[in-house]
Amino acid sequence: YKCFPGGKFKVLTLSYDDGKLEDKRLVDIFNKNGIRATFNVNSGLTDMPIRLPASEWNDLYDNHEIALHTCTHPTMNRCGSYEIAREILEDKTNIEKIIHKPVRGMALPNGAGNKLITSIAADLGIKYIRPATDQYAVVKSALEYANDCEGPILLGDENGFSMPTDYMNWIPTCHHNHNLVEFGK
């Protein structure tokens, strides 16, 4: 059997994008309950009123992972090789300067990826990507469906929670919808 730190056989991974102000409340809930998550931030968008300033990342996300979400959040499969490399490398470099730790992971903006993006990201030191296939239509459809749905929206392996077979194409199992907090109460 595969075993995780502490002799655990199962793990829960949570991933949140964009470094928004709402993360403060979310991190507080996670910290009170001993839950850790990955927060995928955009170093080039921290001056927006809905985003957390980079100066708050170290304190807020302490005990959580910070991963990149590209510098300016473009739909990456619409970008050329140079822009893909620049978006990833600039975000990775900026974040590492702020948090003084290596950045290993990445979430693709709008879920849009392809083999070129995966290859460039790997060459730049990225160890995992969520998701790395073109899931944009799937995610958009799920979000539209969520308006009339109760509970989480399944995106990946709805019959189980297997370990990813390809960390550079880490498809999520489900996506939070607008009622998820209420369902958890």
Set out the residue ranges of the language-model regions:
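Active-site metal-binding loops of divalent metal-dependent hydrolases
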Residues: 16-19, 70
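Active-site-proximal N-terminal segment of extracellular/periplasmic enzymes that hydrolyze or transfer
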Residues: 7, 11-15, 23-34
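Catalytic grooves of carbohydrate-active enzymes
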Residues: 7, 19-20, 98, 166-185
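Hydrophobic positions within alpha-helical membrane elements
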Residues: 22-23, 74
